[in-house]
Each structure stands twice: as C-alpha cells, then as structure tokens.
Amino acid sequence: AVQATFFWSPLGVVLNGVVIGLITALIALGMLLIYRAGRVLNFAQGELGFIPAVLAVMLIVESELPWAIGLVVGLTASLLLGGAAEFLVIRRFFRAPRLVLTVATLGLAQVLGFLALMMPRWWDSRVASQRIDVPLDAVWDVGPIRLGADHLLVLIAAPLLLAGVGALLRWTGLGVAIRATAERPDRAASLGIPVRSIQTVVWAVAGALAFMALFLRAGVLGLPVGGRLGFGLLLRALAALMIGRLNHLPTVLASSVALGILHQGVNWNQDSPLVGDAVIALVIVLALLVRRSRSDRGELELGVFQAVGEIRRLPVELAGLIQLRLLRWGAVAAIGAFLLWMPHWLGTENLLRFSYLHLVVMVVVSLVVLTGWAGQLSLGQWAFVAIGAVVGAKLTQELGADLLLATLGAGMAGAVASLAVGLPALRLRGMYLAVTSLAFVVAVTTYLLNPRFFDWLPQGRVQRNPLLGRIDWSSSFAMYHVSLVALLVTFVAVTGIRNSRTGRVLIALRENEVAAQAFSINPTRAKLTAFAISGFFASCAGALIVHHQQALVIDDAIRTSIGLFVAG
C-alpha cells in the first residue's frame, strides 16, 4: 500500500522488485530455519553463501567452466560450509546464553566475509560485482525495464526452493524432527531425536539457501561489491522475520517480496538509493509498532538473551583487607599515571587515534547500561552518536555555546531520542528491539542526518572554541586530555549508577522480571530509564566526536554500531 500510494512505479519495476524480494526471501528462510532449530538469530546468514557463491562465480568467469558445473560445485560447498560452521563454531556455544551466540554469529560473519574477499586471489582476481549469465538467450522489455533470463530464473527457481523447504518441514520426518527440536529441545533429546545433528543439517540447508540467493543475485545484479551482504538486504530479511513473528513462514515470505517491491519503487522515484533504505527502515518501525503484542512460543522467551553474568565481587571479609585496598588504589593510580604520561611520547596521529578511542569507549559503556544491565538488545547505538554530533555542533558553532553546555544539551537530545526508540521494547519482546534499533540507525545515518539531503546540518569545519571561554583545546595534545577526562567522568557516573538503586533494579529486571515486579518494581519506568541513560552518554560522546573530527562524519555508521555491540 505504501509503495502504490507514495512511490508508484511501472510494471517492470514491480517485477524487478518481486525478483529482489524472492532473493531476500531465501535469506530470510535460512534465518528462520536456524532460529526455529536453535533459537538464535543468525547474522552470518548472508556470509554463509558468499564463499561458495564466489567460488562458483570464479569457476564460471575466470576458469570458464560451464554454468551448471559452477552451480553444482557451489551448492556442494555451501552444504559443507553450513554444516562445518555449526559443528566447529556454533556447537561450542550450545549451552551459552543466546546473546553470546548472537555475538558469535556476528564474529562468524566477519570471518566468512574476509575469506570471501581473499578467495578470488587464487585466480589473481577480486570481488568486483562480477555477473554470470544463465545459458539461455531471453530478453524482454516490460515498460522501461529490461528483464532477462536471469530474472526469469529467479521467478521460477526461488518459489520452487521455498516450496520445497516448506514441504520438507511439513511432510517429512526430518521436518518433524526440526519442529520438535525447535519446540522442546530437551524433550526431543529424551525421545531419541539427535538434536545437535538436526541443527547441523539445518545449518547445511541454510547455507545452501544463502548460496542460491547469492548465486541468483550474481545473475541479476552481480556479486555484492566488497564481498559482503548489503545491510539493506539484511535489514529487509530481518524485517520479514519480525513481521512474521519468527514463526509464520507464509508471512515471512510475503513480507520479503513486499519489501523488495517497495524498495525498488522508492529507488525508481528517488535519485539516491539511500532514500530507499531509509523508507524501508521507517516502514519496518511502523510495522512493528502497530503489531499487537501477544505471547508466542515462536518468540524469544523471557531471559533468553540474558548476558553471561557479572563477575562476582570479592567477599566483604577479603575486600576489607588493607592489602587488597592498597593494591586496588595502587593499580588505579598506575593506570592513571600511564594515561597521563602516554601523550608525551605519542605523535600527533597516534594522539588523535587514542583520543577517538576514549570517545568510542564512552559509547561502549553506554551500550553496557542498555544491553548488559537492562538486557535490551540494541544494534543502533551509533544513531545516538550521530544525533549528539549534530546537536553539539549546532550549539557550539551557531549558538556559541560552551562545549560543556553543548555536550549536556546533546546528551539530553540523545536521551529523548533513545526513549522514542525504546517505546517498542515496552510492547514487543525478543529481537524486535534489535531490528527496530537497526532500522533506526539506517534511517538516521543514511537520510535523516545526512548532509547530502539537508543543508541545515553542519557542513563545514567544526571549530574547537575555547573551553569555558579561556582554555585552548585546539591541539591534539589538549584533545587527548579532554577525551580522557570525559571517559573518566563517564566511568565514575556509570559506576555510581550501578551501585545505586537504579542499577540494582535494572539487574533484577534482567535476571527475573516477574520476580522483580513482585517487589513493586515498575519495569516500564526502569527500562525507559536505561534507554535514557544509554542515549545520554552515547550522544555526549557524539558531541565530543564531532569536535574531535572537526566535521560531521557518519560514513560506515551501521558497521560501527554492530562492532560496538560486539565490543559491549
């Protein structure tokens, strides 16, 4: 409805959107299978298909082997790679909290993406959007769009693959075993079902689906530039899963196709493809907000994304020993002296790097409050950094505010924005917040706060005006100390919050929300507090980062957000 109303496009564009949507559906189906079998959202789903897809394309393009041989070799490699990934990596986290396993899939995606980039070197080549053509000669024009045999292959092969997997799950013994493992893994194991072997098979099938998606995409659009799955495709696949509540296969597949049509319609009506990702992100947020909240066994149960746990504190008897207290304060003093002495032997370039590192650690600390304490999974922390950067630069450059006031103002703006993003978390469970926050960072950094679209955003050089009207901090040496002081203040503030009632309440909610409510704790208020605190510190860091960089830089914000999540 959104596409037809606001982004009308001719039939050829709609058909092209169906093609892209079917490719997205293959990715989403693989993610759904893995989630149903192991209750983990696999962020490495696209990368599972890259290595075999690159192998198949290189065999066809560089070695000049027939198209069918490349397909068979790639499909075989994808089955082996999917099974190996589960056996060598995922199985090691079988008993770990799902949050840890989610981080493991993010790390697996990085490794597989790197290997996909390295593989073409065997042919003295590189991943450069190579295309492969189906050995059929068919071209027809549908309005202004020219479709070929590669599009026809997707329209035929993708529905057959989707129907085949659906039949496998519904009418075969393997499908029954997969569904039993997904519903009650412990009971399935007690009935003699090899749960871990079933998961290996599921990962192998998911790897094959990922390969077919990338192989078909190579015929239509070519291999992804840089050897990595585009975040737009990943976001659409995640959105389809969330709309289908990680459970209803027809809804997931229909949503994938609908989002593909919408994306192509937006691109047809707009000059920049970045607008398409922003519109998709907005539609995702609205779709998740209007869904009615209800309990579903397909969703993540309470506490499934609980962190590993905190390091136990020393017993009171040991902590009170004078030797340990002296050791603790001595270690703090030694670290402080080292940090203060370090800039004297660092060059300008390294000083700026360490200054930036201090500010990034501030963002990581803000994420610890939200995910580590409150148990809310967020992938969009860098969006609040961007908001803080814009507000901080506007306050100092246009209104002449002091850096301290600008940083506090940016923090308040980030807290308000974080509350707005956190509202879905009060109605929706599990991974919905992760997808909402990922959609939010895509919308903010690709369009809403992109200087290419809005001239009111900071465009030129951001000057470092004197601090408190008299302290010059324009040098890299002074910038280092400003960032260090900001990091120390953040540590002290967050430590105080952790030791206060607010921190204890957040930990209690993360561990057992039902029991915490029995002690008259308001979970809504506590979660919103965590969002506000997290957004405040992230935006404060953003205000300092824009002055450190002396320009508004939001490139690669999505990967940075995911990297911050892994670090946190």
Can you say where each PLM-predicted feature lies in the sequence?
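Hydrophobic core segments of alpha-helical transmembrane domains in multi-pass membrane transport
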Residues: 1, 56-57, 75-81, 108-117, ...
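Short, hydrophobic transmembrane alpha-helix segments
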Residues: 2-14, 32-41, 57-69, 268, ...
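Transmembrane alpha-helices and adjacent helix-loop boundaries
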Residues: 8, 46, 99-128, 149, ...
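Hydrophobic alpha-helical segments within and immediately flanking transmembrane helices
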Residues: 23-31, 41-62, 77, 81, ...
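Alpha-helical transmembrane segments of polytopic integral membrane proteins
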Residues: 28-37, 56, 81-87, 108, ...
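Helix-capping/transition residues at the boundaries of transmembrane alpha-helices
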Residues: 35-38, 60, 90, 94, ...
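Membrane-cytosol interface at the C-terminal ends of specific transmembrane alpha-helices
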Residues: 160-182, 199, 203, 215, ...
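Interfacial "coupling" helices/loops that link adjacent transmembrane helices in transporter permeases
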Residues: 173-199, 510-514, 521-525
